[in-house]
UniProtKB/Swiss-Prot annotation:
Entry keyword annotation includes Kinase: yes
Name of the molecule in the record: Bifunctional protein HldE
Catalytic activity, EC: 2.7.1.167, 2.7.7.70
Reactions catalysed: D-glycero-beta-D-manno-heptose 7-phosphate + ATP = D-glycero-beta-D-manno-heptose 1,7-bisphosphate + ADP + H(+); D-glycero-beta-D-manno-heptose 1-phosphate + ATP + H(+) = ADP-D-glycero-beta-D-manno-heptose + diphosphate
Region: Cytidylyltransferase, residue numbers: 345-476
GO CC aspect terms: cytosol
Annotated catalytic residues: D265
Keyword ATP-binding: yes
Organism: Alcanivorax borkumensis (strain ATCC 700651 / DSM 11573 / NCIMB 13689 / SK2)
Length: 476
């Protein structure tokens, strides 16, 4: 499929309800084996606390720029206070039901040389708690939100999933569930379930092949009155299933996998935020797949930011060079500037590419680190040059220009001048070729206003597209 459309995540407000926990990390080097037992000795040099479980889902949403509200159950202890502090710093709204006498669920991981050596769980599940106060808190927050995520780790917070799903359906809010266990009946009526393959097989039995997965998944969708199911399949990617519609399979995108901790949280958070922001299901799934590829390349419970996701979507479209839309170009420029690179901008019709163009573009490229070449659209050229032009249509001109070594990015514009594009890009250097003075270059005042440079370069004498066209017509 084509690159997914990224909606405005800032417009999304999502409610997350489920099992919250604190992910604690002890980091340190290890260089010897304990004399007491055949285990490595880790000298702890760094302590780190991160929100986990449903709290990590909410944190992922906040990192994307969305507004997240979180309903969960905790103890009345230091771990709960740390969770509230970390989440408040990310502007996540916390609505915790605090229980006396029980600890906040905490998972301690010992990390050395970027490897997890040991995990210790500190928990007593909240299964004996009255679910009514939790449901009431969900009901209060639901009226302000565009999607509900149920993040189920089977720790007791989601004791009444049918009731919560009914509340959401009554409010017309889609419900996304990250399921747990061998029985998906409590999630009946949800909009979308996101089991991993192991969780899926625990319910439907061993999957023999692709067709078996599709058949069993669609049957489960009908049995549970779901709209869709997304089965995440580790290195095999993910598969979206809907009753009566063709399956959509997306291959895994991760180049390196360091840690799958929290990857499911990332998937469901991107799905929910995308749908709440108005994205189509196919786009939401594609974005979630790309985000999963980013997060598994990080160590520990991690989040994916909106700029990271935009850059990854941009990279999905190619090698980071060549013909781009304006939106793709702005992302590429943002990435280049983050590396300290200077952006050079030039523009023109480039109807018939000749030696003068090649020499000019090579010189222009040397004025900085990256060269943006803005090309007049066909209608723009007709207005400027007359009804007989262009000789070559836009797509062909851009393809040839993108193949030149000096050119990093090629983008089209349909206006008579490139000023709107200049205002979006804000290049470090504006370059124009020909017999101009700096004051005659379109956009010079704007570029100088923020400290940019404006330069005029020479074309090779006696070579121009107009002269070439005239010679061809004379011979005809």
């Amino acid at each position: 499929m084509q690159n997914p459309h990224i909606p405005s995540f800032a417009q999304a407000r999502v409610l997350v309800a489920g099992d919250v926990m604190l992910d604690r990390y002890w980091h340190g080097p290890t260089s010897r084996i304990s004399p007491e037992a055949p285990v490595p000795v880790v000298r702890v040099t760094e302590l780190e606390d991160r929100p986990g479980g449903a709290a990590n889902v909410a944190l992922n949403m906040a990192a994307l720029g969305a507004r997240a509200e979180l309903v969960g159950v905790t103890g009345r202890d230091e771990a709960a206070s740390i969770l509230e502090e970390r989440l408040a710093a990310a502007e996540v709204g916390c609505h915790f039901q605090k229980v006396d006498g029980l600890p906040t669920i905490t998972k301690l991981r010992v990390i050395s040389r970027q490897q997890q050596l040991l995990r210790l769980d500190f928990e007593e599940a909240f299964h004996s708690q009255d679910p009514a106060p939790f449901a009431e808190q969900v009901k209060q927050q639901l009226v302000h939100c565009g999607a509900l995520v149920l993040s189920d780790y089977a720790k007791g917070a989601l004791r009444d999933c049918p009731g919560l799903i009914a509340l959401a359906r009554e409010a017309g809010v889609p419900v996304l569930v990250d399921p747990k266990g061998t029985d998906f009946e409590p999630y009946r009526g949800a909009t979308l379930l996101t089991p991993n393959l192991s969780e899926f097989e625990a319910v439907v039995g061993v999957v023999k092949d692709e067709q078996d997965l599709i058949a069993k998944g669609q049957q489960l969708i009908r049995d549970l009155d779901l709209q869709a199911m997304l089965v995440t399949r580790s290195e095999k990617g993910m598969t979206l299933l809907r009753d009566g519609l063709p399956e959509l399979h997306l291959p895994a995108r991760a180049r390196e996998v360091f840690d799958v901790t929290g990857a499911g949280d990332t998937v469901i958070s991107v799905l929910a935020v995308s749908l709440a922001a108005g994205a189509a299901m196919e786009d939401a799934v594609a974005l979630a797949n790309i985000a999963a590829g980013i997060v598994v390349a990080k160590l520990g419970t991690a989040v994916v930011s909106a700029p990271e996701l935009r850059r990854a979507v941009h990279q999905e479209g190619g090698s980071g060079r060549g013909v781009m839309s304006e939106a793709q170009l702005l992302i590429a420029i943002e990435d280049a500037r983050a590396q300290g690179e200077r952006i050079v901008f030039t523009n023109g019709c480039f109807d018939i590419i000749h030696a003068g163009h090649v020499g000019y573009l090579d010189t222009a490229r040397r004025q900085g680190d990256r060269l943006v070449l803005a090309v007049n659209g066909d209608e723009s050229i007709r207005r400027l040059k007359g009804p007989g032009r262009p000789i070559n249509p836009l797509e062909r001109r851009m393809a040839v220009l993108a193949a030149l070594e000096a050119v990093d990015w090629v983008v089209a514009f349909d206006t008579d001048t490139p000023e709107p594009l200049l205002e979006s890009i804000k290049p470090d250097v504006l370059v124009k070729g020909g017999d101009y003075s700096v004051d005659q270059v379109v956009g010079h005042e704007f570029v100088k206003s923020y400290g940019g440079e404006v330069k005029v370069l020479d074309f090779i004498d006696d070579i121009s597209t107009t002269k070439i066209v005239e010679r061809i017509r004379e011979k005809d």
